[in-house]
Amino acid sequence: MIRKAIESDKKAIYHMWKEIFAQDDNGYTDYYFECLFKCENTWVVDDGGEIIATLQRNPHTMYFHGMPIKTSMILGVATLPSRRKEGHMHALMREALKQAECEEMITLIQAYDPSLYKEFGFSKIYYRNRIAYHRNQIPVYTHLEITSEVKAEELANVYQAFTKRFDGFFVRDRAYYENYFKEISAEGGQIVGYRNKNGELEGYMVYYTEKFTCEIKEIIYLNSWAFLALAGYGATKCMKVMIHTSSSEQILKLLPGGEVTQYQFAMARVNDYSIFNILFDTSVQNVEEAFEICTRPLFLHEYA
């Protein structure tokens, strides 16, 4: 039977994640179950007391076309290998989306295999770029302005200012960044900020180093100098630098010579087109058309 999770299910769900998502773990699973897991956001398939499948739907506030709206991210869709192809994923998705249709306009999903979710009305909407540089391609400025001493409230303020040029993004607050610190630490990463001459934070980046590569998973900046100072700091760490950004940011204009690879990040679903069209005074008929009403480029970098 399908039901909401209870506290005694947590251990079984945790072990399912550790087995099924082992290739992408890097400490994230432990962080997630310590800081983000909530039973009220979790569905399970219970077969005689054994948890054989699960998914989670975490609520967020999205800023969409000039207004904040409720949304959620579906993640952690998992079935025990021995119980696959029995329809459990489909049943869980139908149950979760039935509730989503009553609570929110748009639902997102992190999809390992996007083809599995098209039948539920999801379409590929969010993309990100991965830009590869050799350290010699990045000018290294003095990093006296780079600091590891950054506060959650400062980061939230910088993110809020940065996202004014975007649409379709999740709202972040101080509590988000307090958890973000824990996530970065759990996965072996670092976060540093850039301060101007007045000591004001004007950007930050989250990066991970492995062998010869510095991977900048998130870089948020209020001006070109902040971006260049942070990227230059990354170039002091390793021979290769990989910078992840939204697909709309014109990074090559700031830092030419990089090799750009675009990848799909998240899918989206409109839960009720009639209400959507009334609310936004449109006549859209599919997800792509719904997001095309946004007058600014999309930004999203939440996994949960």
Which residues fall in each region the model found?
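Active-site/acyl-donor-binding loops of N-acyltransferases
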Residues: F122-P139, K217-S224, A231-A304
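Conserved acetyl-CoA-binding loop-helix of GNAT-fold acetyltransferases
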Residues: G76-T79, K85-K98, I109, Y221-A235
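Amide-forming acyltransferase catalytic core, primarily the GNAT-like/NAT-type
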Residues: S123-I220, S224
